[in-house]
Amino acid sequence: MRLRPHRAIWLFVISAVVASESQPYTQVRAGPSPTTASDDVVLRVIVVDTAEKAQRLVTRLNSGENFIAVARAESIDPTAGAGGLLGQVTLSTLPPALKNALVGVAPGQLSSVVKIPTGFAILKVVDDTDPANRNMNAASSADIPTLATKTSVRYVIDLSGLVEAEAVLQAFPKPADWDQNPRTICQMRRQSMASSQKSLEDFLSPEKPPVGRSPFDLMQAHFALGQLHAYYGRMDRALEQYQRAYQTARGGVPAATLRMLEALGVAHLHKSGMDNGSHRAPGDMCLFPPPEHGRGSGGSYDKTSDSRRAIEHFLSYLKERPDDHEVRWLLNLAYMTIGRYPDSVPPAYLIPPSALGSTEDVGWFRDVAPQAGLNVVATAGGVIVDDFAGTGRFDVITSNFDSCGPMHYFRNNGDGSFTERTSAAGLDDQLGGLNMNQADYNNDGCKDILLLRGGWEIPQRKSLLRNNCDGTFTDVTTATGLAKPATSTQAAAWADINNDGWLDLFIGNEENPSQLFLNKGGDGFEDISRSAGIDRVAFTKGVSAADYDNDGFVDFYASNFKGSNFLYRNNHNNTFTDVSRAAGVPGPGFGFATWFFDYDNDGWSDLFATSYVTSVDESVRPYIGLAPNATRLKLYRNAGDGTFLDVTAELGLDKVYMPMGANFGDIDNDGFLDIYLGTGNPSYASLLPNVLLRNKDGKAFVDVTASSRTGELHKGHGVAFADLDNDGDQEIVAEIGGATPGDSHPLRLFENPGHGNDWIRLRLVGVKTNRAAIGARIRLTVENEEGRTRAIHRVVGSGGSFGASPLEQHIGLGRSARIVEVEIWWPVSNTRQRVVGLGKNQTVEIAELARSYTTLERRPITLGGRKAAP
């Protein structure tokens, strides 16, 4: 969710405007600037919190340390993940202190330390002749493919206010133990935003003497104030400030005029969506493509004035930059909102309707969340679908990235509806948290919750919420030893690393080393990170666990936003070795969601690793027949010998999707696992359809987003697959919403229309193995009506790293299938348990080493009172 480098420059220079008069820039390098408006350079920056630390870094850099690596490890600026890349800058538009600091600095050299309101900055002028700098966004490892040259990848414009909100919260005074109390962080967020808004309003006051306020300063101040309003969705006030910034740019900062024009278009389009209810009661408005490409119900807005203004701004922009694919895409979306796509779109900018459809029809997955009572409107967050009440029915729990936003716990009533029981469950105080997952850490038979906080922002404590088996939860984070140190994280995986029957916990942190906690019999956890060899800093955004080499011990994969990913092979003694390079799975770079799954049913866990390239331009290039320039996600097929093969292109996944939340399931019960990707980034310009990919017999993935009607345009986060109506097929539960309160959105529950194939659900209960059976392997042999047999493989777990499906395994069998045998491998007892005679289309419970199984009643219900699918 962090904004990417070309847009991050706004924060860097806006900080000069946000500063109060008592905290101006300190001029380090004196003398007039020799630059002119044509002096464009590419800059990198490192920002730290003290002058002493900055000077130490200068010494290190001058001694030969790599600037990109130091920026990633030390910088507190939002550009850190990209090695401090600010992008191409016109020097004459910079504040005087920054211009002066760069006087006489040649390409490849450093500036002196510059005091800015967010800290102390070191600038570097990038040398384009240096091969190391020709790919501006190259990851630190040579194994990672670069994004391309700096002119090839166009990052999305920053329009949301999140970067500004993060910066002011970072700088805000903090009381003792602030990172241990979510309510304190909520108060800090509100106070820091209010204080910054007042500072900007004071700076822009007409009563303030004009001395020292250049056109650049005024433009940036208006833009920054607009961002603070946009953060909360106050778009009328935001647009007023953006308009003033645009007028100021036209009069005194011509280099910024086009960017401001695009910002106006994006802001008007966002306001249009808000005014038409697309963020509160969207119905089909946000589903892409709209019915008949914008004609008919659900495809257009009733109030169109702001959409029309957006069109005007986008057209003006495209006259100057006709090859800007991001703005071209937004222009087509704007025409859809007024019901004039494709007929009224200028031919030069039209994205043809033929590019928007699916080649295969999987039926319409209708959103029934409002009818089912899943009435939650929230920012970005995670989702868990599982039985938390012991009723045999799947409940739904969501989290909230907003520092002041609560969790929501919806109890399944068993009649197709859900009732919110957050307060009754004791979860009112669980504010914030971008992601979460479930596990039975104490083996009491009731699923607990791990809530992860601080992802993309300041460090915060996580919360382990023990299920009391009576409909309530108790926060046991401190008691179990998980509260300190507070870290920034949204990535964690549960696994029994030593086969002692207790689930251990891997936490993938961002700016702190990753952590591995050994479960001490359900009473607490011991931090063994250092001795285990996994305490590395890599801005980890996803973690997955599986026994990839089938040696009986679980391994981990860490997906990292900085540098290459890590494949940690279990050494059978509570230590791990990173074998990612030898195994051929360094990842695509800019890693995010990830998971192990057996996509081809050969009995070996394959590996899916996404790349989070925040470029609308790159994501929409296939719609206009262009190949992307940026790095793509990766699908690695397990070769069965400790190595993996990159089959991304071979299976049709060689695209840029901008995925965040993601998970897998079997939408058509054919036995092959499909994928749903939640897309976007915080910017209000990031309007990309979420993506549903159907697995065709383990040989290809086909995009069925359009035919399924699951292409929600707003930000997709936690994803889960689950059969919520007990009719034998999996629904898709998608937590939708951006990173700011002004981009909140309702949850989506896409009801599966059914495909006529058979299925079985297996609820495994560990006895020696952990009670939830996480890590147990299932091999199910089926015979079709022609007498041919095949094997279907599953591993018990909640799925992907961002969103959690039920631990009860739903397995599609295909059409007219007969179950020949179910074989379960239990890790702790190291036994293979075979069950024969199972009927299809039912749910059964199988306990470890038991001689029989139990059939569980799962009565089909009607979601939201609608007629259930046959």
Question: Each predicted region: which residue ranges?
Answer:
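Proteostasis/folding factors centered on peptidyl-prolyl cis-trans isomerases
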Residues: V28-V45, A73-E74, A97-M136
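Gly/Ser/Thr/Pro-enriched helix-cap/hinge segments flanking short amphipathic alpha-helices
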Residues: L651, A700-P870
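Short coil/linker segments at helix-helix boundaries
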Residues: Q180-Q187, P210, P215-F216, G233-R237, ...
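Peptidyl-prolyl cis-trans isomerase
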Residues: L57-A97, D127, P131-R134
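Hydrophobic beta-strand segments that make up the repeating blades of beta-propeller
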Residues: V383, D395-N400, G445, I449-G454, ...
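Beta-propeller blade termini
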Residues: A380-G390, R411, G432-C446, T489-N499, ...
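Short, conserved, GDST-rich strand-edge loop motifs in beta-rich repeat architectures
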Residues: G273-Y301, L452-E457, T610-P628, L677-S686, ...
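Blade-edge motifs of beta-propeller repeat domains
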Residues: D343-A378, F410-L431, L465-T487, L518-A538, ...
